[in-house]
Amino acid sequence: MLEYTAGLIRRNKKKFLISSGIIGVGYYVTKTINNKIQEFQNRIREENFAKEQIKRRFHQTQSDCYMTFLSLLPVLCEPIMDDLPVETITKQLQIRRLEKQIGNKDVKNSGSTVLSDDFSTSQEGAISEDTNKPPELKSKNQLWQELKIKAITRFLTLIYCESLLIVFLHLQLNILSRKSYLETAIRLASETQGIDLVDQESNGDFSGNTQDENLSEQAFLSFSWWLLNKGWLEIKNKIEPCVEQHFGGINPRQQLKINEFAELLNKCQNCIDLKVLNLTEEDIHLGVGVIEDQSQPVGRKSTNFITNALLPPKEFEFFLLQQTNDLDFLSRFNNNIVNTESLNMLLDELNNYLNNADINLIVNKLATLGITKVLDEIVLNLLQKNRPNPISDMNIRDIDLNDFPPYKLAALLANITKQSISLTNNSVENPILADLNNLPELNDLSASVYSNFDP
């Protein structure tokens, strides 16, 4: 039997060798293919996981942007409300009206809070003034003129400053979030796969301690101080002449239809867009703007107004850090030149974004949306008084405003004042602010910043 088997092998040796080779090659190929498939599946899972991580962190960053905006809103609004004291002027008009009604008897000791027909009790509680200091004596007409200009100026200043703050924070936090994610991903790849990768944004410097890196990021976040304390005044000074131009000649007792009032606000906005955003009506219609020369010299000086309103000149940067941080922070920050270099890189990138024409268009869309939402609320408030059935904001677009009677400008100013106060409400449930934060173009901007991994 053994001889027969040995003879069979000798006679078919070549066939056995070929068969064994085929089986061996087949096994190797099959194993290789299986390994490649396994690697491909693992890579797909890793990519999907990475995409989910990026998506999750992106959405978390947008939520952080909104919560940061709400936390800074009182800081932004307080000086604007103080600089444009509409309620104080209203108080003086109330006193004048009361003096006339009761024959100027014991008015100063009455402490009355009676309001005129044109201003509702919604303004109570917003007045903060020194009662021991007598108000400046002005005629009733002067007070009404001042009230008219300040009420509309304050409303538009709040809208534009809040729009700028939203954009500024979305740029800041998405730059930092992308930077943090990229550094984490590179560090993990280096540790788990032994790959020597260089993060071009940090010049491959992973030897510096995390604490120092956090110092530059903290300093970067401090730069919102400029808009909150300086920039808003620049915005207000651009807005007030536009309001004077289009509302200055209108008597507060003059009657206007709602669409006429909206048209006046639109003219003011066009004037503001030209002065603040350097946008004409044609630019807005075409969706284009003036692109700032981004090859800026050292110092980041810019002729773009909103950039100058949002970022300080180079020589004031350390002053800003002094205003926003304690001495211990400043000492630790200055001890390492890398902190200054890292901060400058972040500011340069932010400056480049702010000088892009798309930013001006987004600010315009935010302001337009805010003004539109406020006008919708005013329409609802006015129409609810004259209609027994409630009107929702869902069917307000079906209403023909030409069918409704005109209102005194004073009544419209009262509603503008009421809505201005609502713009200072930093509740998460504030519908107007939520709509601003959910503007699609703002989300697109955030996505483009977050996904920009170019050096």
From Swiss-Prot:
Protein location: Peroxisome membrane
Q: What is this protein called?
A: Peroxisomal membrane protein PEX3
Annotated family: Belongs to the peroxin-3 family.
Kindly list the GO molecular function terms attached to this UniProt entry.
protein-macromolecule adaptor activity
Where is there biased composition of kind Polar residues?
113-125
User: Is Membrane found in the keyword set?
Assistant: yes
Q: Which PANTHER family match?
A: PEROXISOMAL BIOGENESIS FACTOR 3
Instruction: State the conditions that upregulate or repress this gene.
Output: Expression is induced in the presence of oleic acid or methanol.
Which organism does this sequence originate in? Komagataella pastoris
Gene name linked to the record: PEX3
Domain of life, source organism: Eukaryota
- Region (Disordered) residue ranges read 113-135
Q: What does this protein do?
A: Peroxisomal membrane protein required for peroxisome biosynthesis. Shared component of both the peroxisomal docking complex and the peroxisomal translocation complex. The two types of peroxisomal matrix targeting signals, PTS1 and PTS2, are first recognized in the cytosol by their receptors PEX5 and PEX7, respectively, which then carry the cargo to the peroxisomal membrane. The peroxisomal targeting signal (PTS) receptor-cargo complexes interact with peroxisomal membrane protein (PMP) components of the docking complex.
Where it mainly occurs, coarsely classed, is membrane
